[in-house]
Amino acid sequence: MSMTDPIADLLVRIKNAAAVGKQTVKAPSSKIKVAIAQVLKDEGYITDLRVTQLENNKSELEIVLKYFEGKPVIATLKRFSRSGLRQYRGKSELPKVMNGLGISIISTSKGIMTDAQARQLGVGGEVLCFVA
């Protein structure tokens, strides 16, 4: 089965697992998914991530979700740029999520990073998603 938007699939898996209180989420792995999960870990939205090698040269990404007082730390997780309509922003047009309380994840020429890191480096790019 082919996926038209693997990033949206990962975000929906995380959102659904957090909504029902699961501890971990498993998804097919790719470099961009691992980079997005690493940004979420660095920003404190998830506890840990692991990449497991499977047969047939495939790998699986396992994300350990984070909860605070029984509620998921990730309250909002929304895909912004999608396969049918890519959303690119310059360094001065990068969106702030909830006036800086959340983050937006940006794919830049220097890698995948948060909006704050992209502003600090003075680069723009494709706005992948919002997290709050």
From Swiss-Prot:
InterPro entries: Ribosomal_uS8 (IPR000630), Ribosomal_uS8_CS (IPR047863), Ribosomal_uS8_sf (IPR035987). GO terms for molecular function: rRNA binding; structural constituent of ribosome. Keywords: Ribonucleoprotein, Ribosomal protein, RNA-binding, rRNA-binding. It comes from the Bacteria. PROSITE patterns: RIBOSOMAL_S8. GO terms for cellular component: ribonucleoprotein complex; ribosome. GO terms for biological process: translation. Belongs to the universal ribosomal protein uS8 family. One of the primary rRNA binding proteins, it binds directly to 16S rRNA central domain where it helps coordinate assembly of the platform of the 30S subunit. Part of the 30S ribosomal subunit. Contacts proteins S5 and S12. This is Small ribosomal subunit protein uS8. The gene is rpsH.
